């Protein structure tokens, strides 16, 4: 996380938690000459609806406007949303929540000739995950060292 996203996370986390929500991620990016501050929040169980996101957006906007000095070098567009069904797996809490779920994993280097896998997360520890994947018509467990995981997210199984 950058200093800006860390500061935003520090501001948003207590606001979200006070409402029973969870801060999932913060992104501060520049796209086509425009800055965007994207904040992803969720609520367990059942998720968060658009009205709740709109209410939280107003609270967050007010708090960010009060920051002094202003941490944003340029004007930006504030976007609050749910992370969706394919939410990223970013921290240990997310990994524990993903146990037994169908996930997508992208790797820095190939394992068994592949750089991406989708399957059910069967087990994990600090060093590795065990993923049950379907190869043609058979299921196989693959052990993936966590240090080679570039990104991971929940996935929808078809």
From Swiss-Prot:
What SUPFAM superfamilies is this protein classified in?
A: YhbC-like, C-terminal domain, YhbC-like, N-terminal domain
What are its GO biological-process terms? ribosomal small subunit assembly; translation
Q: Which GO terms describe its cellular component?
A: cytosol
- Check the UniProt entry and state the signal peptide residues, or none: none
Compartments, as annotated in UniProt:
Cytoplasm
Listed InterPro entries: Ribosome_maturation_RimP, RimP_C, RimP_C_sf, RimP_N, RimP_N_sf
Q: Does the keyword Cell wall biogenesis/degradation apply?
A: no
The entry's keywords:
Cytoplasm, Ribosome biogenesis
Matching entries from Gene3D superfamilies are given as: Ribosome maturation factor RimP, C-terminal domain, RimP-like superfamily, N-terminal
Q: Please tell me where this protein is predominantly located.
A: cytoplasm
What family classification does the UniProt entry report for this protein?
Answer: Belongs to the RimP family.
Report the protein's function. Required for maturation of 30S ribosomal subunits.
Name by which UniProt lists this protein: Ribosome maturation factor RimP
What organism is recorded for this protein? Answer: Lactobacillus gasseri (strain ATCC 33323 / DSM 20243 / BCRC 14619 / CIP 102991 / JCM 1131 / KCTC 3163 / NCIMB 11718 / NCTC 13722 / AM63)
Q: Which gene encodes it?
A: rimP
């Amino acid at each position: 996380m950058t200093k800006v996203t860390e500061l935003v996370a520090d501001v948003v986390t207590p606001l979200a938690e006070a409402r029973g929500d969870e801060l999932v991620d913060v992104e501060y990016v520049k796209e086509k000459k425009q800055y965007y501050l994207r904040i992803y929040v969720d609520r367990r169980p059942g998720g968060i609806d658009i009205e709740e996101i709109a209410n939280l957006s107003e609270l967050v906007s007010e708090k960010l406007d009060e920051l002094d000095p202003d941490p944003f070098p340029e004007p930006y567009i504030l976007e609050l949303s749910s992370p969706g069904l394919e939410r990223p797996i970013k921290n240990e809490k997310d990994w524990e929540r993903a146990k037994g779920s169908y996930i997508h994993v992208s790797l820095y280097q190939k394992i068994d000739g592949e750089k991406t896998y989708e399957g059910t997360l069967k087990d994990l520890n600090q060093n590795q995950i065990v993923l049950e994947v379907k190869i043609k018509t058979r299921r196989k467990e693959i052990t993936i060292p966590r240090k080679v995981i570039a990104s991971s997210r929940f996935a929808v199984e078809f």
